[in-house]
Amino acid sequence: MNAIRRLYALTVWLSTLLSAAVAAAVQASAAPALPEQLHDTGLFAPGQPDMLGAGVEAFEPQHPLWSDGASKRRWIRLPPGTAIDARDPDRWRFPHGTKLWKEFSHGRPVETRYLELGADGQWRFATYVWSADGRTARLAPAGGLTLSVEGAPAGRYVVPSRDDCLACHTGARSPVLGVGALQLGQDLPRWMREGRLRDAPPAWRERAPVLAGVTEAERAARGYLHANCGHCHHGAGGVPVPLVLAQDVAGNAAPAPAQLHEALRRMSTREPTQQMPPLSTRIPDPHGQALLRAWLDQVPVSSIR
């Protein structure tokens, strides 16, 4: 059984690395240079680092990604006169020129990650590292780096390489994680009314879709798995493993109890060949573990195979 588990982990790891390598080669081909400083990406108003740039809006996903206890803030900007194509409710298509930012903090801002959809239809990924005084943020090396940060696990903070960013984002249903019908909650009806979405179900104007589930514990666990595992385990490409943890608007995805136990086991370890997610986390998430245990406590023993 241990040999099978290690083969499974190796398959996932190699698939992730291959996806990142291919995507990195595509991104590097004739791509314009990334801005050297965060303020040149448009997040802030010109000359006013305490004010958001024109058209930039904050948002908060209902089910956030675990990031080793870091606090996060997120923003999005759509080009004027454009809207997100939501005709496929689970695979939104963003207009060229879309920009997104995510700030990671441990008592102070440490890094801000940046996504931009170019005119060529290719997503570009970058990370900006903040100065200790929080006044400026500069482009990090493409290979990433490790910082000494008070409050981070063991005082060390790993800024991901661009290949690491690509490994998670390019294997997902959409390269944009955390922005979708099941994540925006009550922001979704507002976005509909403001014209930020097109070709979306009219019912979203009044009410956002909810995760499937009989109990609140089940819905909470599904949401956690969707946000933390579903970008790879979605059954439409991603990793070549028969495990679907992404949820969809129709509520079709339902992992078997035995799969839930395996997901919990991998969430609870940081052994390199076993841990899930395989990247960007060095300590398990106690809240996520508690959510899965609460759901499993409600599953009849007879259904666990």
Q: Where are the predicted features?
A:
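N-terminal secretory signal peptides that target proteins for export/translocation
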Residues: 1-6
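Short alpha-helix capping/helix-loop boundary micro-motifs
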Residues: 84-89
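Short, well-ordered loop/turn sites that connect or cap secondary structure elements
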Residues: 94-97
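Bacterial N-terminal signal peptides
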Residues: 9-23
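N-terminal pre-domain segments of enzymes
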Residues: 26-78
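Sequence context surrounding c-type heme c attachment/ligation sites in exported
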Residues: 26-29, 91, 109-305
